[in-house]
Amino acid sequence: MISLTEDKRMLGYEALAPYPDISCFVTTRHGGCSVGNYASFNCTPYTGDDTECVRKNQEALRAALPAYPQELIIPFQTHSTDSLVIDETYQHATCSERHSMLQGIDALITDMPGYCICISTADCIPILLYDKQHRVVAAVHAGWRGTVNRLSLIHI
């Protein structure tokens, strides 16, 4: 892991550093405004954290990235094997439709530039995939259920 920010709030993967057309990172708990159980850099809106703190943390994350993404796409993960392809259908959906599309999703896949696909992990494994020929990225949340159900093989 390499630090992408001076305050070490974002870490990167050396193995993916040679691909300048993608940004790949892990956030830490440091550098945000959330308090209590969510202290301090919580960017996930599904935790019960204060909505304004989550918004500020997400804005700080977007500002810290090499290219400002038009959207952080954060699914409501349920330790399933369900995935969502972020494509024109998602892009043209209403906010309410997007929220519904992201329910129960544990893997995001896209070839659309400008979107930041996100997964949340604690004791689970983040699997980040990149197909440089087709310029497709995937972010897979692999908990024990996903591992048992071969979630990573489904998406490779």
Go through each PLM region and give its residues.
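Active-site microenvironment for binding and transforming phosphate-containing groups
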Residues: 1-154
